[in-house]
Amino acid sequence: MFEGILPAIITPFYRDSRASLDIEGLQSNIESLLQRGVHGIVPCGSTGESATLTFEEHEQVIGKAVEVVDGRVPVLAGTGSNNTEEAVRLTRSAKDAGADGALIISPYYNKPNRSGLIKHFTKLADLDIPIVLYNVPGRTGQNLQPDLVAELARHPNIVGIKEASGDITQISRIIEETRDEEFSVISGDDAMTLPVLAVGGAGVISVAANVDPGRMVGMYEAFRAGDLARAQVLHYELAPLMRAMFIDTNPIPVKKAVELLGMAAGPVRLPLDELDEAKTEQLRKVLVNHG
């Protein structure tokens, strides 16, 4: 269900005192991505600043994404929380809005034990919406181990994982352990897209695709067509851009890049702060060289 290039979209804000939601800009950005051939849309993830969106803003962003996409590609909505009941509320709302699936980050800060993780993810999967797990140890302080993922994958509604550990050995093991299930392993790091595809992964939930969806889609489609040489060329063309997306905390650089390209972006919300002048110039040079 979820494969290919799926941009983790930014949430554009106005440059007003509240950094209020720019729904028209959101609509424009999504339509632009769809016109460039992306295979899915992922609102309200880390890149979409979900941590600083209110519940009502989550509803607005996901609802608008579903409306604009209009069935052309899947919408995978970020609905995770370290509060299980809040995650249930967000996930139920996304389902009611028409999202095709829910992206559920591993609970952060409170570091649940194994049985707590199983109960948390199972409670969400029992809402009868396809669930994609999200493993990002650098943000959560906890790594979803391959054997745990394999156990969760036996639930019929747990259909994949966004894997952002950066560990190709672990990613390969998850693919190996879930081969008997209808389960997609999706890279959570742009730079790992081609390696993950090579070991049997399904695609990437991408930051860089906000900036250059065309080349990201081209790399994926070249690989799927068996043209590894072309996929490698595009991988290395994209590499400087991929690195530039992490010269500061995500999504600070990608929002600035999108703004520099003339699309809707606006500020990041506190406690994140905007890119400083030196890094902005560094990013500008990468964009100019990228072409």
UniProtKB/Swiss-Prot annotation:
One example GO MF annotation: 2-dehydro-3-deoxy-phosphogluconate aldolase activity
UniProt entry keywords in alphabetical sequence: Amino-acid biosynthesis, Cytoplasm, Diaminopimelate biosynthesis, Lyase, Lysine biosynthesis, Schiff base
EC number(s) reported in the record: 4.3.3.7
Location of this chain's protein in the cell: Cytoplasm
Entry superkingdom: Archaea
Biological process according to GO: diaminopimelate biosynthetic process; lysine biosynthetic process via diaminopimelate
Chief subcellular location: cytoplasm
Reaction(s) catalysed by this chain's protein: L-aspartate 4-semialdehyde + pyruvate = (2S,4S)-4-hydroxy-2,3,4,5-tetrahydrodipicolinate + H2O + H(+)
Transmembrane intervals: none
Subunit structure: Homotetramer; dimer of dimers.
The protein, known as: 4-hydroxy-tetrahydrodipicolinate synthase
Organism, scientific name: Methanoculleus marisnigri (strain ATCC 35101 / DSM 1498 / JR1)
Lineage of producing organism: Archaea, Methanobacteriati, Methanobacteriota, Stenosarchaea group, Methanomicrobia
